[in-house]
């Protein structure tokens, strides 16, 4: 069989693509010039400025909400911004097709954007400090620095897997003999991760946005407080209002996998 292509008269910035189950909906936001198409068995969407290969993202509809949330956490931790919709759906599709978390994180870490953001990768103590700031929003405590730095130096934790290990450590069960201060910090770290995950899901999945500058600004607006969470959410709504106009930005929404994290 030949490749099935759906062709459109405008550039991608004027369209919203929605993925749900095995269906793709394409909406022209320019006042109905191309209308709304409900598509099945289409491999490629062809616009004036580019073609979109749906096979790269279509399996994302099969990922569980829990796995999508974990992927968003890794994405934010490694890029230091909210996910872009297409990139997130690409990795979500790969995960649904069998790529493991460790393989995804390793592939992420090889990207120049990620490596440059961590600074000097030979300064392992600096990498640990950087990771705590970007993943947990705080300075590393002495115990954390003394725990992780030797593991990296001795190769017991691979550099590419450190962020994954750090996130999993936050979620791990608390030993019975740990202090209340340790418990309180662990709960605060988990809450910080959860808030950033909600913002990432809202930006990339619920709203389907991909502008990297906006994705960076959203995470910069959040500092761990409830007020900043609301401010970051409001910023997403603001940029979405501009992006969803007839000449805004390409939006790629994933429907039915995760709930709107800010739904009343």
Residue spans of the language-model regions?
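Acidic, glycine-rich low-complexity repeat segments characteristic
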Residues: 1-64, 128-130, 135
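Substrate/cofactor-recognition hotspot
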Residues: 43-264
